[in-house]
Curated annotation (Swiss-Prot):
Residue ranges occupied by any KH-like domain in the UniProt entry: 358-439
One MF annotation (Gene Ontology) recorded for this entry: ribosome binding
Origin species: Thermotoga neapolitana (strain ATCC 49049 / DSM 4359 / NBRC 107923 / NS-E)
Name of the gene encoding the protein in the UniProt record: der
Protein name: GTPase Der
Protein's GO biological process: ribosome biogenesis
Residues the record lists as binding GTP 1: 8-15, 55-59, 118-121
Taxonomic lineage from the root: Bacteria, Thermotogati, Thermotogota, Thermotogae, Thermotogales
Length: 439
């Protein structure tokens, strides 16, 4: 794990900064010099990125007692081994000989340094009186913050992540992935959902164990295929014939679809190939996408389509046009009655789930972003600085921009396409985007 060290002379607010960045009070904060005797460390997680943060004792220029000398020795050794150092100075009162002495050591050590000016609540005075003298330390532009009042800490975190990733360090938080894939087979009435479910079980020679439902949860089936566990949700709804009056069937089936989709990881969207794609099919597919679920699209009853051998391209085009919002989904042609193509469904589910739980390195994302932006005209006044993946299930990306109001649907389409074409295809999975204003 990457290690970031907070260093500085006593009483510049290192421990307060540490506590704010780790979001808990772990380092003792007092107004007396030398309160922090031993290094304190904790893990910082920020938008899916993780690193170790260490708060060191204040470095005295000329320590007088044995303990202070030992503290300084420990801190200087830790600096040599750190991946990045946050050099904290007093942005209210300016720098001293102690700061200059520590700056000299940091430059000679060759460690990467971010200069942090703390206590800059009076921003105007800082810019006018203090900031110019900080350039003497030799670390470029300082980042002004107020740890006590949590001012500008996001900017500092962005810089930390950027610096660490430039060094090629792995900051990704390892995702926790559930043991079994939860699958919902969804579609409008009479498209062959039940037949398809049973065909999967028969074709895959699956071992099935009903999981009893409660008053709130429908019955599920735990299915083992090639030693791998899958949970098909609401299989009771797939097995029993409807006892509901015809005029309420659509309303009831829509309710069941919503419930099943919410509980699933992957939705298998079943279409009737003899009827094409209807408005209700589009609504169901749209619901899957909005709920952030992975998906596989199945044209069932393919055996009943005339001249089917010559019509794969026609139906693929129909799928791309009418279900364009889930066109990342694997498309399969089946006949549940005859068992055609059924064996491909589990493979497609595995592919979609793998995409759904994939996390890509920020270095790959930002490398692609910079290359594509070099020949892309963004709306006037919009700048995209960098991005990172902050979640899975579904894959969610956060982009830092100068103006979030400039982000419209075309920019979202552009970024999703960039991710799929240049970073990772995420076949079968939606991609969610978030935006945050940054300077």
């Amino acid at each position: 794990m990457a290690t970031v060290l907070i260093v500085g002379k006593p009483n510049v607010g290192k421990s307060t900064l540490f506590n704010k960045l780790v979001r808990k009070r772990k380092a003792i904060v007092e107004d007396e010099e030398g309160v922090t005797r031993d290094p304190v460390q904790d893990t910082v997680e920020w938008y899916g990125k993780t690193f170790r943060l260490v708060d060191t004792c204040g470095v005295f220029d000329n320590p007088q007692d044995v303990i202070s000398k030992k503290m300084k020795e420990v801190t200087l050794n830790m600096i040599r081994e750190a991946d990045l150092v946050l050099f904290v100075v007093d942005g209210k009162n300016g720098i001293t000989k102690e700061d200059e002495s520590l700056a000299d050591f940091l430059r000679k050590s060759g460690v990467d340094v971010i200069l942090v000016a703390n206590k800059t609540e009076n921003q105007r005075r800082f810019e006018r009186e203090i900031k110019p003298e900080l350039y003497r330390l030799g670390f470029g532009d300082p980042i002004p913050v107020s740890a006590e009042h949590s001012i500008n800490l996001d900017t500092l975190m962005e810089k930390i992540i950027q610096k660490l990733e430039e060094k090629g360090l792995d900051l990704e938080t390892k995702p926790e992935i559930t043991e079994a894939i939860k699958i919902a087979i969804v579609g409008r009435p009479n498209v062959g959902k039940s037949t398809l479910f049973n065909a999967i079980l028969n074709k895959e020679r699956a071992l099935v164990s009903p999981i009893p439902g409660t008053t709130r949860d429908p019955v599920d089936d735990e299915v083992f295929i090639d030693g791998k566990k899958y949970i098909f949700v609401d299989t009771a709804g797939l097995r029993r014939k409807s006892r509901i009056e015809p005029k309420t069937v659509e309303r009831y089936s829509t309710y069941r679809v919503v419930e099943s989709i919410e509980r699933a990881d992957v939705a298998v969207i079943v279409l009737d190939a003899t009827q094409g794609i209807t408005r209700q099919d589009q609504r169901i597919a749209g619901l899957v996408e909005r709920k952030g679920k992975a998906s596989v699209v199945v044209f069932n009853k393919w055996d009943l389509v005339e001249h089917r051998e010559k019509r794969y391209d026609e139906f693929t085009k129909l799928f791309r046009e009418k279900l364009y919002f889930v066109d990342y989904s694997p498309l399969i042609f089946t006949s549940a009655d005859k068992g055609w193509g059924v064996e491909k469904i589990i493979d497609a589910i595995n592919l979609a789930y793998s995409s759904y739980t994939t996390k890509v390195p920020s270095s790959a994302l930002n490398s692609a972003l910079q290359k594509v932006l070099a020949f892309t005209n963004l709306p006037r006044g919009l700048k995209i600085f960098f991005g990172l993946q902050v979640d899975i299930k579904p894959p969610t990306f956060l982009f830092f921009v100068n103006n979030t109001e400039k982000i419209k649907e075309p920019q979202k389409v552009f970024l999703r396409r960039l991710i799929r074409e240049y970073v990772f295809p995420f076949e079968g999975s939606p991609i969610f985007l978030k935006f945050k204003k940054s300077r």
